[in-house]
Amino acid sequence: PIYIEIGMGKGNFIIKNAIANPNINYIGIEMYDSVILRAVEKTNELELNNLYLIRMDARLIEEVFDKEIDLIYLNFSDPWPKERHTKRRLTSPRFLARYDSIFKDKKHIIMKTDNIDLFNYSVESLKEYGYNINDISNDLHSYKDNIITTEYEDKFTSKGIKINYFDASKN
């Protein structure tokens, strides 16, 4: 299987997943050089055979993958709060259409965010696009144990900020 994280930041989440699940291939996607460099430095020390990093804009995702992805993680994505920026959200209909061509069989997206407006928008967007919400919480850390966290997630939870989460799929 191949799992990707779009907007992986410094890579903490995807690196921890690759270590914990050696039989799954992980691909981290990040658009900013300075950020992905941090992840590259961390991964070089670990010599993981199941983790790959790509510096690219997510708008080009269809040019890189074709019916081979099993799961997409969207962790603490930019909420693009202004109405005119809605199309830039990684859960906008425009992005969901892009994802259609990269999924192998079943479409599967897991999202975590501290931003309730982005969360609500994303849940509605996925439902309108035909996804089923399999699991959902507005307080992930009181709901599940043994969570692999992101750097942002650690920062927010240490301040008492609740993490919104959903797991959605579409056949």
Mark where each language-model region is.
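Class I SAM-dependent methyltransferase "Motif I" SAM/SAH-binding loop
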Residues: G7-G9
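S-adenosyl-L-methionine
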Residues: V40-D66
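Short beta-strand element of Class I
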Residues: I24-I27
